[in-house]
Design a protein with these regions (language model features):
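Terminal or standalone catalytic/regulatory effector modules within metabolic enzymes
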Residues: 15, 30, 36-54
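N-terminal phosphate-binding or glycine-rich loops at protein starts, especially the Walker A/P-loop
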Residues: 11-33
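Generic hydrophobic/packing signal
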Residues: 9-10, 20, 36, 40-43, ...
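N-terminal amphipathic alpha-helix/helix-capping segment at the start of soluble metabolic enzymes
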Residues: 1-18, 66, 70
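Active-site beta->alpha loop and helix N-cap motifs at the rims of alpha/beta catalytic domains
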Residues: 33, 48-153
Length: 153
């Protein structure tokens, strides 16, 4: 049985650059047609990481920005995904379980199909709830391990 290979466009550090290189949503929607026209991506990373915080710095409403940015991809049949920091999913410090659970429902409502979860500590106690919450919200859950080198990890 042959396996289908799907390519994903990932902006690894773009959303984490404290606004230095992150385009506004009006700029993002202008490049969406070119990405779609390439015809090689089944999935596009549209938010997560620092994306929403940067929207706020620009004075944009993150809810509106994510919806606008994901819309052209959905119309073209392309799934969208986001970076998720597991326990630190909403900020750089731990977030309570009830807030994390709501987070996935909101992201799905905004138009995000897939959550790509990682935990800097590779701690399954932080990753497992993310998988559950994503599935409960109707999202696809992908997880990754981090390459960590230290005497402790």
């Amino acid at each position: 049985m042959k396996k289908e290979i799907k390519f994903s466009l990932v902006f690894r550090d773009m959303w984490q650059s404290a606004g230095k290189y992150v385009p506004r949503v009006d700029q993002l929607v202008k490049v969406a047609p070119a990405i779609i026209e390439m015809g090689c991506f089944a999935r596009v990373e549209t938010n997560g990481g620092g994306f929403e915080q940067v929207n706020l710095l620009f004075g944009e409403n993150p809810n509106k920005a994510v919806r606008e940015w994901t819309k052209p991809f959905h119309e073209a049949g392309i799934q969208t995904h986001m970076l998720d920091r597991a326990l630190n999913g909403l900020r750089m410090s731990p977030v309570p379980a009830d807030v994390r659970k709501l987070f996935y429902k909101v992201k799905k409502a905004q138009g995000t199909d897939i959550t790509r979860t990682f935990c800097g500590l590779n701690d399954i106690r932080n990753i497992a709830p993310s998988i559950t919450y994503a599935h409960e919200a109707g999202m696809i859950s992908q997880c990754s391990l981090c390459i960590t080198h230290s005497p402790i990890h």
